[in-house]
Amino acid sequence: MPDTRDLYDDAVNLVRNRTHLRVVEYIRGHPGAYVSDILEGSDTPRGSLGRVLRALLELDVLTIDVPPEKRGTGRNFRYTVNEVRVRQLLTALHTELLGE
């Protein structure tokens, strides 16, 4: 289990970027979304979306339906929000800011 400070840092990285939040919000409402869906539905510029998705995957906020050993095979990924992780990050942010 990561320590609370790491969780807080990850939470700040999630919420400091409105584009990250917009993408998470879209995918949460459309689980299993493809990149083309996310581009259209979140109004995220094509040039930014790959970077945003990688950042959210690194934070473990998103999951994809392709196991690591199958990635790079040309298959389109379907993205889903890891709601447990989002709650964990928001709880860490709440605890750090409000001490509760």
What are these regions (language model features)?
Residues 1-8, 29, 78-100:
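Amphipathic alpha-helical dimerization/coiled-coil segments
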Residues 44-58:
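Short amphipathic alpha-helical interaction segments
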Residues 21-25:
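Pre-recognition alpha-helix immediately N-terminal to the DNA-recognition helix
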Residues 11-19, 34, 67-91:
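Short, cationic-aromatic polyanion-contact patches
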Residues 60-67:
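A short, conserved structural fragment
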